[in-house]
């Protein structure tokens, strides 16, 4: 319940701050599904199908943010909220990795790839039609689809999800049968 409440509060705060612009970010697409996932856990409903979609993106978002975006991020800006940043680019990954009752399989790699590809297609259409963030800037500095950098990062994000999903499915989850454990919330 703690993860669900934390993510829901952060989401509502972000929604008030960014308004309708919130869903131009891959982070919030993923966070939306993470809130649904933890909500389903709370209600005792099956979550396995959703877990296999969002685990790899949560890891890619965390690593991608801290390795690619954070070094260029205007941390001194008064609009930066470090708690919001830590929750949406780290805590969510930790929350999902601690869900030991869940398993993902290599054969499910298409799920995070489809999710990421749908987002990439949306972002290309959004930016291509002149869409910007609430500050009037591109949603991401690399979302320049009139230049090679935009396409390179789109492919890198998709490929990163492929590698992460295969890696996690291969190394964290062995071929041993899943052990029934209570849901950790």
Question: Which residues make up each language-model segment?
Answer:
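Membrane-interface transmembrane-helix boundary segments in multi-pass integral membrane proteins
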Residues: 127-172
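Interfacial segments of alpha-helical transmembrane regions
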Residues: 45-57, 105-114
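Non-cytosolic membrane-interface motifs at loop->transmembrane helix junctions
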Residues: 20-28, 50, 74-87
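Alpha-helical transmembrane segments in multipass membrane proteins, preferentially the mid-helix core
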Residues: 90-107
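Membrane-interface loop-to-helix entry segments
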Residues: 81-91, 152-156
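Non-transmembrane, juxtamembrane loop and terminal tail segments
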Residues: 177-185
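Early transmembrane hairpin module of multi-pass membrane proteins
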Residues: 1-49
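Juxtamembrane "helix-exit" motif on the non-cytosolic side of transmembrane helices
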Residues: 12-19, 66-76, 128-129
């Amino acid at each position: 319940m703690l993860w669900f409440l934390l993510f829901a509060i952060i989401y509502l705060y972000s929604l008030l701050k960014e308004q309708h612009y919130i869903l131009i970010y891959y982070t919030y697409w993923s966070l939306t599904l993470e809130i649904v996932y933890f909500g389903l856990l709370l209600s005792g409903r099956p979550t396995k199908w959703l877990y296999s979609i969002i685990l790899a993106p949560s890891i890619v978002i965390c690593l991608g943010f801290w390795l690619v975006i954070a070094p260029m991020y205007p941390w001194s800006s008064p609009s930066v909220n470090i708690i919001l940043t830590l929750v949406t680019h780290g805590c969510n990954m930790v929350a999902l990795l601690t869900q030991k009752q869940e398993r993902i399989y290599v054969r499910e790699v298409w799920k995070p790839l489809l999710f990421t590809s749908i987002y990439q297609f949306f972002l290309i259409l959004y930016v291509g039609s002149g869409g910007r963030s609430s500050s009037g800037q591109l949603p991401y500095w690399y979302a320049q689809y009139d230049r090679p950098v935009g396409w390179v990062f789109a492919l890198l994000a998709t490929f990163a999800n492929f590698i992460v999903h295969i890696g996690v499915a291969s190394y964290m989850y062995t071929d041993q049968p899943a052990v029934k454990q209570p849901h950790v919330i």
